[in-house]
């Protein structure tokens, strides 16, 4: 991945720390990957039609699997209606300076004209700050993605439970 033209995380892109090119491949079709594709899609259709292309590669059968209900359906429908290309049950097999290869249905396919690779997978909780504070004797409550990767609904619920116990 280090040799690919332009690699960034979804967090950096959404936070304005990195800027994508014209053909964007997003690896990871979870909530973050789909939200990133949805965010980029208006740039494709509203500002400069046919000037950019967004592809999402997801290993599993289901996009945004951790989301539920109407929110998930709205996100996926909106993303697809904006022209985002989705490859489910596809696994990235190789990333070189010039290409991204993936396996789907037992065949290897290559995207050779992409200029931006966005990583939107593999999030892990980070409890370092809470651990350091606890070691210093400070009472802590670890919530949201710092505790376990999830969604805003779960984080709010966890926060409510802790607040009720204080």
Language model features with spans:
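A conserved short coil-to-beta-strand element within the FAD-binding core of flavoproteins
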Residues: 88-99
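Helical element adjacent to the flavin cofactor pocket in flavoenzyme catalytic cores
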Residues: 75-84
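Rossmann-like dinucleotide/flavin-binding elements
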Residues: 1-67, 101-166
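Charged helix-capping and loop-helix junction motifs
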Residues: 70-74
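Short, conserved active-site loop motifs that form the nucleotide-linked donor/cofactor pocket
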Residues: 5-7, 83-85, 90
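Residues that recognize and position ribonucleotide moieties
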Residues: 85, 93, 110-111
């Amino acid at each position: 991945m280090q040799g690919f033209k332009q690699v960034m995380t979804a967090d950096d892109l959404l936070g304005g720390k990195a800027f994508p090119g014209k053909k964007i491949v997003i690896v990871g079709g979870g909530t973050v990957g789909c939200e990133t594709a949805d965010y980029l899609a208006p740039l494709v259709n509203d500002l400069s039609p046919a000037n950019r292309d967004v592809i999402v590669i997801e290993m599993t059968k289901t996009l945004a699997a951790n989301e539920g209900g109407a929110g998930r359906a709205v996100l996926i429908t909106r993303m697809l209606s904006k022209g985002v290309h989705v490859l489910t049950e596809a696994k990235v097999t190789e990333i070189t300076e010039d290409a991204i290869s993936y396996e789907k249905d037992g065949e290897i396919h290559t995207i050779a004209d992409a200029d931006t690779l966005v990583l939107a997978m593999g999030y892990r909780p980070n409890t370092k700050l809470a651990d350091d504070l606890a070691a210093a004797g400070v009472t802590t409550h670890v919530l949201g993605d710092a505790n376990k990767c999830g969604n805003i609904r779960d984080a709010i619920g966890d926060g409510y439970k802790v607040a009720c116990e204080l």
